[in-house]
């Protein structure tokens, strides 16, 4: 009489075969040599004896054993067979003392195929084991541009440091993102203790996630990456299952964002239409507001911080005591969570962090303190539990380009930018198009101030106009900011594209006070992040003209300014070509705000290049990596 355990396992196997046949699917074990005819020619790397996730055991190496098992490794042979007897003895041994002998397998594209030990895998799968010990040889596919192959080689870099193979990600960039989250700049190879600690956190997270209502929303490893983005590795290792459940409940909008593959909602102008009576009843607004501004530096050493502080103070003064604000400086030297807790206990219910360097900490705080409104000064960020903001500077840059092209007495204009972040390339291109509008033969020489090995365009002679850093306040000429021209042998201030933080902060305060802030809450709850990207129309950016600008040029600039603000003129109307001569924007094509924001090319009258990450100074590299990490969407 056959063993009852084998009968139960075989019943599951026969049921799976019937179900798969009904769906027109192969019911038996996948065989790697059938899936990959050239498998014998692949290079091999001996990984030795490692513990692998049993869910990653995808099939068998050779076709000979595949019909003895269903696709999920349940046995299929008759109950009175020698195979069944061996399977039953192995099952009894497992229940008594566990299966100790490792299987032999090959790994291909982070899936494992059994060479020897099929029944051991079958028994372990039936009893719900999580892992199995295996002697593994890795089969390396040739490198190619195929997405799956490229992701796999990113996985190999991840594995080289962690020796963790159970994380399954399929999007380009996901493994480098995960490695950065876990290790930062430290690429020291993990020892067994660190591996065990991390895997313990992973399996605990998977169990909680699987048992939650979100368990079928997206892949568990995609959810894991987003969890690590928000709470960090320390939380994964230390949280109890109950605390993990609470954390997951706090980031439902974040997980919905992944599930829906949501891009940020770019709010390009403040709401101008009067709110309906239903909206006012549902979201009536507040009478008083307390807002804290957190800066990584202080106003004495940072012009950026100084400008935001001026905007904060002016915005508060304009609202006649309805808003109380405070500034907190040098957050780089403070405990972020402790600072937020103290502010919240003091009654502050709105927090602005004024640099993307504080974005990761702001994200963690937004998950922990859901009764506080958080905003970070960055853009194109896909995190719905906070809001982000940044000026639409390319509109003003186009206008300063008009001035440079009209007044420059040579065909060479220099443009100095800081580092390649979102919206930066749109500003460069808009300036170059402004130059080209009035001076078709002029070239714009691009220089990056944050590039360590900068050369090339800056060495060219004949430069008679320089567009430098934007003006954050009104004293542009005194601080040598904006556009300068060499006229009659002297360097003369011609124009500045300026940032009006006081206007932005006042309008955001007003939206909370009148309740219109909450009109966008349902968007966030559905998983879409709110990014304010206001420009000329909102009064958040503007252009200041120097005394040297001729009346005719000034009139042209003011005319175009009004038309851009009203939507009657678009700087990026086609046809537009990039530096290689490729048509990027066709005649009549209207770019969406997101397409403008995510420009990753330069127009054809720009001389220079977009620097790679490794050429940037460490501070600039840090900021770019933070913005990339915060915009990345893990696996759906």
Residue map of PLM features:
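An alpha-beta-alpha
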Residues: 312, 399-442, 526-548
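Segments of small-molecule ligand-sensing domains
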Residues: 515-635
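Glycine- and acidic-residue-rich phosphate-binding/metal-coordinating active-site segment common to enzymes
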Residues: 104, 108-109, 115-178
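Extracytoplasmic "Venus flytrap"
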Residues: 290-310, 315, 326-333, 423-425
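Hydrophobic alpha-helical segments within soluble ligand-binding/sensing domains
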Residues: 389-411, 498-519
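Short, charged/polar connector segments at secondary-structure boundaries
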Residues: 1-119, 126, 171-183, 210-273
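Periplasmic-binding protein-like
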Residues: 348-356, 375-377, 463-472, 491, ...
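Flexible loop/hinge segments that line or gate small-molecule binding clefts
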Residues: 367-390
């Amino acid at each position: 009489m056959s063993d009852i355990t084998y009968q139960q396992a075989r019943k599951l196997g026969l049921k799976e075969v019937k179900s798969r046949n009904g769906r027109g699917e192969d019911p038996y074990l996948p065989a790697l040599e059938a899936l990959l005819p050239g498998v014998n020619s692949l290079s091999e790397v001996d990984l030795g004896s490692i513990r692998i996730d049993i869910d990653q055991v995808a099939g068998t190496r050779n076709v000979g054993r595949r019909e003895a098992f269903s696709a999920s490794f349940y046995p299929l042979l008759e109950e009175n067979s020698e195979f069944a007897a061996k399977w039953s003895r192995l099952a009894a041994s497992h229940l008594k003392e566990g299966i100790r002998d490792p299987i032999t397998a090959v790994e291909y594209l982070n899936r494992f195929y059994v060479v020897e030990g099929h029944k051991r895998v079958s028994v372990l799968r039936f009893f719900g084991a999580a892992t199995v010990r295996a002697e593994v040889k890795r089969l390396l596919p040739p490198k190619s541009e195929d997405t799956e192959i490229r992701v796999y080689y990113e996985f190999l870099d991840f594995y080289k440091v962690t020796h963790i193979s159970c994380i399954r990600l399929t999007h380009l960039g996901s493994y480098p993102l995960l490695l950065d989250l876990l290790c930062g700049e430290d690429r020291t190879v993990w020892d067994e203790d660190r591996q065990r600690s991390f895997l313990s956190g992973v399996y605990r997270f998977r169990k909680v996630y699987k048992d939650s209502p979100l368990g079928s929303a997206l892949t568990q490893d995609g959810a894991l990456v987003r969890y690590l983005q928000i709470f960090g590795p320390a939380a994964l290792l230390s949280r109890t299952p109950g605390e993990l459940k609470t954390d997951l409940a706090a980031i439902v909008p974040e997980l919905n964002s992944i599930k829906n593959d949501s891009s940020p909602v770019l709010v390009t102008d403040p709401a101008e239409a009067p709110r309906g009576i239903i909206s006012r009843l549902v979201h009536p607004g507040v009478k008083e507001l307390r807002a804290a501004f957190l800066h990584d530096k202080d106003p004495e050493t940072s012009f950026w911080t100084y400008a935001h502080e001026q905007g904060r103070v002016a915005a508060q003064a304009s609202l006649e005591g309805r808003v109380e604000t405070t500034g907190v400086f040098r957050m780089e030297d403070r405990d972020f969570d402790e600072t937020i807790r103290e502010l919240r206990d003091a009654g502050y219910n709105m927090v602005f962090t004024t640099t993307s360097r504080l974005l990761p900490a702001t994200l963690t705080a937004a998950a922990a303190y859901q009764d506080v409104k958080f905003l970070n000064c960055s853009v194109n960020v896909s995190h719905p539990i906070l809001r982000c903001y940044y000026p639409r500077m390319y509109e003003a840059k186009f206008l300063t380009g008009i001035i440079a092209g009209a007044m420059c007495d040579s065909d060479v204009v220099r443009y100095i930018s800081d580092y390649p972040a979102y919206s930066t390339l749109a500003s460069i291109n808009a300036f170059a198009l402004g130059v080209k509008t009035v001076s078709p033969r002029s070239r714009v020489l691009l220089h990056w101030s944050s590039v360590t090995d900068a050369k090339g365009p800056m060495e060219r002679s004949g430069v008679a106009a320089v567009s430098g850093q934007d003006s954050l306040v009104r004293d542009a000429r005194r601080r040598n900011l904006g556009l300068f021209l060499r006229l009659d042998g002297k360097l003369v201030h011609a124009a500045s594209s300026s940032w009006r933080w006081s206007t932005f902060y006042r309008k955001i305060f007003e939206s909370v006070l009148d309740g219109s802030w909450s009109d966008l809450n349902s968007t966030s709850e559905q998983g879409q992040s709110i990014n304010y990207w206001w420009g000329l129309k909102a009064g958040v950016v503007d252009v200041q003209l120097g005394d040297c600008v001729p009346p005719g040029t000034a009139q042209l600039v003011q005319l175009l300014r009004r038309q851009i603000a009203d939507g009657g003129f678009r700087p990026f109307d086609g046809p537009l070509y990039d530096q290689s001569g490729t048509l990027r924007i066709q005649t009549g094509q209207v770019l969406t705000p997101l397409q403008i924001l995510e420009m990753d090319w330069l127009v054809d009258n720009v001389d220079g290049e977009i620097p790679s990450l490794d050429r940037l100074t460490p501070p600039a590299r840090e900021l770019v990596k933070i913005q990339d990490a915060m915009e990345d969407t893990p696996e759906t």
